[in-house]
Amino acid sequence: MKRTLFAAVLMFSSFYALGQSDNPKFDQALAKSLGGDDYGMKMYILVILKTGSFSPEKRISDSLFMGHMQNIKRLADSGKLIVAGPMKKNERNYRGIFIMNIATLEEGRVLVDSDPAVRSKLLDAELFQWYGSAAHCLST
Protein backbone atom coordinates (compact mmCIF):
# COMPACT_ATOMS: atom_id res chain seq x y z
CA MET A 1 0.00 0.00 0.00
CA LYS A 2 2.82 2.40 0.89
CA ARG A 3 4.58 1.66 -2.41
CA THR A 4 1.40 2.30 -4.40
CA LEU A 5 0.77 5.57 -2.58
CA PHE A 6 4.40 6.64 -3.02
CA ALA A 7 4.28 5.78 -6.75
CA ALA A 8 1.06 7.74 -7.20
CA VAL A 9 2.49 10.80 -5.41
CA LEU A 10 5.69 10.56 -7.45
CA MET A 11 3.73 10.27 -10.69
CA PHE A 12 1.50 13.27 -9.94
CA SER A 13 4.52 15.29 -8.79
CA SER A 14 6.19 14.58 -12.12
CA PHE A 15 3.15 15.79 -14.05
CA TYR A 16 3.02 18.94 -11.93
CA ALA A 17 6.70 19.67 -12.52
CA LEU A 18 6.30 19.16 -16.27
CA GLY A 19 3.38 21.59 -16.30
CA GLN A 20 5.45 24.35 -14.75
CA SER A 21 7.29 25.93 -17.63
CA ASP A 22 8.39 29.49 -18.24
CA ASN A 23 6.51 31.58 -20.76
CA PRO A 24 9.02 32.23 -23.56
CA LYS A 25 7.23 35.51 -24.39
CA PHE A 26 7.53 36.88 -20.84
CA ASP A 27 9.85 39.91 -20.80
CA GLN A 28 11.12 40.36 -17.23
CA ALA A 29 12.87 43.66 -18.04
CA LEU A 30 9.69 45.10 -19.54
CA ALA A 31 7.62 43.90 -16.58
CA LYS A 32 10.03 45.56 -14.13
CA SER A 33 10.07 48.80 -16.16
CA LEU A 34 6.26 48.89 -15.85
CA GLY A 35 6.36 48.37 -12.09
CA GLY A 36 5.66 44.65 -12.25
CA ASP A 37 6.80 42.05 -9.77
CA ASP A 38 8.60 38.78 -10.56
CA TYR A 39 5.40 37.47 -12.15
CA GLY A 40 4.83 40.55 -14.33
CA MET A 41 1.92 41.63 -12.13
CA LYS A 42 1.24 44.77 -10.10
CA MET A 43 -1.43 46.38 -7.97
CA TYR A 44 -3.98 48.73 -9.49
CA ILE A 45 -7.03 50.44 -8.04
CA LEU A 46 -10.36 49.11 -9.33
CA VAL A 47 -13.28 51.51 -8.99
CA ILE A 48 -16.89 50.40 -9.30
CA LEU A 49 -19.23 53.30 -9.95
CA LYS A 50 -22.81 52.90 -8.73
CA THR A 51 -25.96 54.98 -8.95
CA GLY A 52 -25.74 57.62 -6.25
CA SER A 53 -28.37 59.24 -4.05
CA PHE A 54 -28.70 62.48 -6.06
CA SER A 55 -31.39 62.50 -8.78
CA PRO A 56 -31.33 65.93 -10.41
CA GLU A 57 -33.32 67.21 -13.34
CA LYS A 58 -31.99 66.23 -16.77
CA ARG A 59 -30.19 69.52 -17.45
CA ILE A 60 -28.12 69.20 -14.27
CA SER A 61 -27.53 65.48 -14.79
CA ASP A 62 -26.29 66.15 -18.35
CA SER A 63 -23.92 68.82 -17.07
CA LEU A 64 -22.54 66.52 -14.37
CA PHE A 65 -22.01 63.72 -16.89
CA MET A 66 -20.21 66.13 -19.20
CA GLY A 67 -17.88 66.94 -16.31
CA HIS A 68 -17.56 63.21 -15.60
CA MET A 69 -16.42 62.56 -19.19
CA GLN A 70 -13.96 65.48 -19.05
CA ASN A 71 -12.54 64.08 -15.82
CA ILE A 72 -12.13 60.64 -17.41
CA LYS A 73 -10.19 62.24 -20.28
CA ARG A 74 -8.01 64.22 -17.87
CA LEU A 75 -7.16 61.12 -15.83
CA ALA A 76 -6.51 59.04 -18.96
CA ASP A 77 -4.27 61.74 -20.43
CA SER A 78 -2.26 61.77 -17.19
CA GLY A 79 -1.74 57.98 -17.43
CA LYS A 80 -3.52 57.37 -14.13
CA LEU A 81 -6.67 55.91 -15.69
CA ILE A 82 -6.11 52.95 -18.00
CA VAL A 83 -9.62 51.48 -18.31
CA ALA A 84 -12.99 53.20 -18.06
CA GLY A 85 -16.36 52.13 -19.27
CA PRO A 86 -20.04 51.71 -18.55
CA MET A 87 -21.80 48.57 -17.42
CA LYS A 88 -25.03 47.18 -18.77
CA LYS A 89 -28.08 47.86 -16.57
CA ASN A 90 -28.04 45.47 -13.60
CA GLU A 91 -29.81 44.79 -10.30
CA ARG A 92 -26.89 46.14 -8.23
CA ASN A 93 -27.04 49.59 -9.84
CA TYR A 94 -23.44 49.31 -10.99
CA ARG A 95 -22.89 51.97 -13.64
CA GLY A 96 -19.26 51.65 -14.68
CA ILE A 97 -15.68 50.81 -13.80
CA PHE A 98 -12.29 52.46 -13.71
CA ILE A 99 -8.94 50.73 -13.44
CA MET A 100 -6.38 53.21 -12.18
CA ASN A 101 -2.63 52.91 -12.58
CA ILE A 102 -1.87 54.18 -9.07
CA ALA A 103 -0.52 52.62 -5.91
CA THR A 104 -2.90 53.43 -3.06
CA LEU A 105 -6.58 53.51 -2.22
CA GLU A 106 -6.04 56.96 -0.74
CA GLU A 107 -4.77 58.39 -4.04
CA GLY A 108 -7.63 56.62 -5.79
CA ARG A 109 -10.15 58.25 -3.48
CA VAL A 110 -8.68 61.71 -4.16
CA LEU A 111 -8.81 61.14 -7.93
CA VAL A 112 -12.34 59.70 -7.87
CA ASP A 113 -13.54 62.57 -5.69
CA SER A 114 -12.29 65.00 -8.36
CA ASP A 115 -15.15 63.76 -10.57
CA PRO A 116 -18.15 66.13 -10.44
CA ALA A 117 -20.61 63.23 -10.80
CA VAL A 118 -19.10 61.59 -7.70
CA ARG A 119 -18.80 64.84 -5.72
CA SER A 120 -22.48 65.59 -6.36
CA LYS A 121 -23.52 62.03 -5.36
CA LEU A 122 -24.96 61.37 -8.82
CA LEU A 123 -22.51 58.44 -8.72
CA ASP A 124 -21.04 56.63 -5.72
CA ALA A 125 -17.70 54.85 -5.93
CA GLU A 126 -16.29 51.74 -4.27
CA LEU A 127 -12.52 51.26 -4.49
CA PHE A 128 -10.57 48.01 -4.34
CA GLN A 129 -6.98 46.92 -4.81
CA TRP A 130 -6.69 44.76 -7.92
CA TYR A 131 -3.71 42.61 -8.92
CA GLY A 132 -3.28 42.45 -12.69
CA SER A 133 -0.74 42.31 -15.47
CA ALA A 134 1.72 45.21 -15.45
CA ALA A 135 1.26 45.32 -19.22
CA HIS A 136 -2.25 46.77 -18.77
CA CYS A 137 -0.66 50.20 -18.56
CA LEU A 138 0.73 49.76 -22.10
CA SER A 139 -2.76 50.29 -23.48
CA THR A 140 -2.67 53.99 -22.65
Name each model feature, range by range.
Residues 20-140:
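Conserved, structured core segments of small domains
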Residues 1-22:
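Bacterial Sec-dependent N-terminal signal peptides
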